[in-house]
Structure formats: structure tokens, C-alpha cells
Amino acid sequence: MIHTRALSPALGVEVTGVENLLDETVISRCLEALTWRGVLLIRGLHLDDEAQLAFSRRLGTVLAPAGKEIFKISLDPAVQPSAEYLKSTFHWHIDDTTNEVPAKATMLTARHVAMTGGGTEFASTYAAFEALPEQEQKRYEQLRVVHSFEAAQRLTHPDPSEQEVAAWRRLRSHETSLVWQRRDGRRSLVIGATADHIVGMDPGESRAILDELLEWTAQERFRYTHEWAVDDVVIWDNTGMLHRALPYDPASRRTMHRTTIAGEEAWG
């Protein structure tokens, strides 16, 4: 029998008692939990890549070219050639803010974990927005934000070369509402490392607001910290959960296998 347990007051749920991961009831409960709790944890599944893909495909359409559905997250360039770019994931961020349609969800399975550190933190931008005073909610609903790859990379490379900046700027930026209201009526903040500036606002004031909102959302009451064990599976609502990796030894073998579920609704 399937059971669920809250991982923190505002977000996160652990699902236990799963015998057949592809069972329709299991899939339905997982999707429901993901919608209302944002982060879903299942332990001890021992998924290989094939099983992870099968599970991911039951949750939605896997967002990747055929044969490249599994993305390895590691700071070892021999494992992940893009390891240098992954250093920006130590900052709070939401994936796909520079795309027209964000990914619906992300799934990680832990293949190797760090001896110390290396956890993943999540913060609910739904809960953070709902806790704001009504006057502030109304103000922020009128604002729009430009997101860029460059903004995130400058956090880890504050003194980049001209070549690095040129490479970052070749990637698209995207403008979104600061507050995204979905078709189902739920509202969340679209903030994080990629948030470059608020449209039409003085740069100093813009940065102050974005930093204040990030600090507000990262409060403990809106946050869940996951300490990884091998074979843990964590799935999260990519559109409403900020996330970041916690520091760990770059020489660690920490490796996560990621699949991404395609979204169905464009940013506001």
C-alpha cells in the first residue's frame, strides 16, 4: 500500500510502499503529490537508466533527443564535459527560464554521493508568494523580468573574459512575468540566478527587489534540504521550486542522472 509523509511544512513528500513503479495508481499518486507538494522523494528503488526512463515517460514526455535522455550531473569533466557550467547550480535557480515553455518536472537519481556536503535544497516559490502581504503581491504582479544564461554564469565567474561573455550572450534570453499565474490559478515567483533585471526599472532598484525576493523565498519555512543516499529518486516541479546544490569536494564522485519532463504551459 502506498503511503506519503510530508518532508517539511511547505513542500516535499516521501512516497513509500511502492511495489510497481509503473502502476497506474502509483503514477497518479505521484503526479498528484508533485502538483501539491512540489518535491517528491522515493528511496531504495535501485533504478538503472532504462527504468528511470520508463518511469519518466509515464510522468510525461521526456525532453531530450533520442539516445541522450539521461544527463549526467558531475563536476568531473571526464564524466560531464559541461562540468564548468554546472558550478552555477550552487546558486538558487529555476531551470528553463530562458525557454518559451519551461520543463514540467526534473528527476534525479543518485548514483554516487559525496562523503560530505552535496545535498540539494528546494524552496517553494508558490508558498513564498502566498505569504507576501497583499499589497506587495499586487505590485509584483505588474512587473516583468529578463532571464539570461549570462546572469547565472556571472555569479560563479565575476570577472569573465570577452570570449566567455560573447559565448554566454549567444544563448537566448527570455522575458517572463515576475509572478506567473498558471491556468489552474496558482501563482509563483519566477526568480533565481538567471533573473538579470526587471524591465523598465533602475538597475539598482531592480537588483534590490530581485535579491530581496530571493532572500524571502529561501527562508527555512519555505525550504526543504535533501541529503542524498545512493539510489534516492527525487522529482520536483521545475516551474515552482527554486533549487540549488550544496557545496561538496569537486574531487568527489558525486553523480546524479537526470531526466527532464517536457512542460505544457508557456511562461506568463
Residue ranges and their predicted role:
Residues 2-233, 238-268:
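Non-heme Fe(II) oxygenase catalytic core, chiefly the N-lobe of the double-stranded beta-helix
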